[in-house]
C-alpha cells in the first residue's frame, strides 16, 4: 500500500460530452482572451484601488483579478486539450476547482473593503475554507458527487445574504443591481451545470 497521494482519476469521474473541434477552439480562445484581459487589468485595478481606497482595497481587488485569471487560464488549457488525452481529466479537476477560487476571489474585495471587521473576515474565512475543502474533495474523493459540488458553489455564491445590510449602507443601486444580476445569472448557469 502506497502512502503517496494521487489525483482523483477514478472511473467514477466522467468528462463532459465531447464537443466539436470548433466548439473547443472557441471555448479555448474566448477563455484565453479573458485570461489575457485579467493580466492587463491586474496592475490597472491594483493601482486604481490603492490610489482611491488604500492598500486593503488594492489587495482585495488583486485577489479578485488573479482568481479570475486562474479560472480563465485553466479553462483555456482544459478546452485546448484533446478529448482523448490522458491529462484531460486532471485538467477538468483543475478547471472545476478554479470555480471555487473565482467565487472566493469575488468575495474578497467586498469582504475586505465594504464589509470589514469581524463579519468581513468571517466571510473570507468561510469562502476560502470552503474553497480549500472543495478543491481537496475534487482531488481526493473516491467518487465525485457533482450535485454536492454544485451545492458548495451555490452556497458560496449566496453567502451574500449575510452581508446585504453592510453592502446596502456602503454602496448604491448600481452596485446592488450588478450583484443581483451576477447572482441570478450564476444560479441560472448552475442549473445547466447540474
Regions found by a protein language model. Name each.
Residues 2-194:
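Multi-pass alpha-helical transmembrane bundles in non-GPCR membrane proteins
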